[in-house]
Swiss-Prot record:
Protein purpose: Catalyzes the attachment of tyrosine to tRNA(Tyr) in a two-step reaction: tyrosine is first activated by ATP to form Tyr-AMP and then transferred to the acceptor end of tRNA(Tyr).
Protein name: Tyrosine--tRNA ligase
Span(s) of short sequence motif 'HIGH' region: 38-47
Subunit structure: Homodimer.
Single GO cellular component term: cytosol
Gene of this entry: tyrS
Domain spans labelled S4 RNA-binding: 353-419
Keyword ATP-binding recorded: yes
Motif 'KMSKS' region per UniProt: ranges: 231-235
GO biological process: tyrosyl-tRNA aminoacylation
Location of the protein in the cell: Cytoplasm
Species annotation: Desulfitobacterium hafniense (strain Y51)
SUPFAM superfamilies xrefs: Alpha-L RNA-binding motif, Nucleotidylyl transferase
Pfam families: SYY_C-terminal, tRNA-synt_1b
Keywords: Aminoacyl-tRNA synthetase, ATP-binding, Cytoplasm, Ligase, Nucleotide-binding, Protein biosynthesis, RNA-binding
Amino acid sequence: MNILDDLKARGLVYQTTDEEALYKRLESPMTLYCGFDPTADSLHIGHLLPVLMLRRFQLAGHCPIALVGGGTGLIGDPSGKTSERTLNPTEVVQEWANRIKEQLSCFLDFEGVGNPAIMANNYEWLGTINVIEFLRDIGKNFSLGSMLAKESVESRMSRGISFTEFSYQILQSYDFLKLNELYGCEMQIGGSDQWGNITSGTDLIRRMSVGEDRQVHGLTVPLVTKSDGTKFGKTEGGAVWLDQDKTSPYKFYQFWINTDDRDVVKYLNFFTFLSIEEIQGLAQEVESQPEKRNAQRMLAKEVTELVHGVEARERAEKISQALFTGGIANLTAKEVEEGFSDVPSADVEDQEMLLVDALIKVGAVSSRRQARESMESGAVYVNGIRQTDTTLTVAQLDKIESRFIVIRRGKKNYYLVKLV
């Protein structure tokens, strides 16, 4: 099967240049690229779709280039932005670029036989560029009218856009040209907001290769949306990162398992490597047995394992199951730290402290009276076990690896006692 057929079946193709020519070209191996600017020290799930697109092309026998924007990251892409980006110091951007390189290595095979992926950093050519030569040889191929007409620029004109960000599309176009010259790269892929920058690159290569048979292509993926109208990739706690130190595998797993029924089939197509037939089967279950949430569980399993590995995925599933069944006592200290990293907590040194007082210290209740009433009514659980004895001390309670006590008051309010 031509990879374009699979991508279209999954809804992953938003726009392409000359689709017929691209389809024919993809019948044999080709080199393509996608760029990732280091705007933070980690990629987030908004980057996941294009990253997985590179992986899909590699699995189909093509050669992907992951381009880290060590140079363009110093400028800032205006696409999709309503205001000027904050410019970061060079050393910070290069440090972030190195961390992003490490993350990309988890998704692509850079040492495989036949079609190993290529890692590049555009700082290699943008960092040493000669301004006069660049304006003479590259700048003359861009008309001000076409640059102003690009959506990423036009949408910012009323609010103001600096020459720095205005020139970004020229730099991205130059990247495509350099990768074409260095590696024979014939296609750039990106999000739908990158269409203007991508076509600027194809136009530049065409103008720079008059008389040569150099045909290049562009492909964009759709914007990932949520049916409830909220922004994809954002939670109450902020962005969902691919770095487990910024978003734990458990929180990452929870993001996917909480997917709306209206979105889950789309996300299975976008973010997993399950076959179209497997996804169709899960889609039928969403219609006939939505309460089982099998599609959401499969989505969370596949994406968490893809990003964080089998062990982290199993740990996330274990924490989720413990919270659902009340089996907190079966968790390890590491799992407790991961699963309860953002609940109210307090350090307790005196293990002779009454549980009633520990409830006050972690913020579960505001007074001893409220603590006693909550316990006597059966609303307080310690490590999954209901506690009604108001005379209990911390020392008398079971602990997780002698380090933690997990308190639940009511159905969903959790608190963590850390023994020090």
